[in-house]
Amino acid sequence: PLLRLIHDPPQRLYVRGDPEVLREPQLAVVGSRKASAAAVRAAETLCGQAVASGLHICSGLALGIDAAAHRGALRAGGKSVAVMATGIDEIYPARHRSLAAELARSGCLVTEFAPGTPPLRHHFPRRNRIISGLSLGVLVVEAALPSGSLITAGTAVEQGREVFALPWSMLHPGGAGCLRLIRDGAKMVLDIEDVLEELGPMYRLQQDLFEAQQGPGDAVAAAASPILDLLGFEAASPDELVRATGLPAAQVMAELSALELEGRVTRCSGGYTRT
């Protein structure tokens, strides 16, 4: 449900594994392909703790942090989603074929690219919007400057998702990107509780989105909403609604998504208007 609400959702998805996993709460975990040993351990530990708390892990099947995130989830008995920049039959990198097979058994592989599509450079940034779009938030474990992980973080912000980053030392070779994200407003993560605390509102609202798609129910958007009360025929931006309601940004974005799904609000260039 969350992916459908981004401004440029994929027209179709090819899935290998269990597609129902895509409907369930996920945390995106990304970072450097040339990850440090400390970052690999951090990714595996945090992802294991996340799945123990009921989240699935979403990442990109790349070397480094992506692989550590997937493995951390699997070792903890959880499920993980790998979003690919190739066709569903083209595993990249090739050394991750066994990892991909394991992911497909408990979670799934997913891509918007047709079977047979090779790993083209310009497909990776497009893939990143799906990683963030499927997820409640994005955790950047390690990132230098520049880094593709920062593209994913930027896309997450545009989609109204929470962004998290680990606070490395300024002397850590792969930590500059994370420090910049924290400077720019990302939530600093010292343990998994920092993530879970922020994702609570988004987690609950995703369940309401799912229930709304199943048919009539008690979705949050159907109840009296302070956001709906504030919207008229002039567009209001999410930032304006955050200030006016005093609600967390994640909750505002989640409620707007639920209201949009129900047809009660319309997204436009200036923000949102009441339908």
Language-model segments: which ranges?
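Glycine-biased, small-residue-rich flexible motifs in mid-sequence functional cores and linkers
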Residues: 1-275
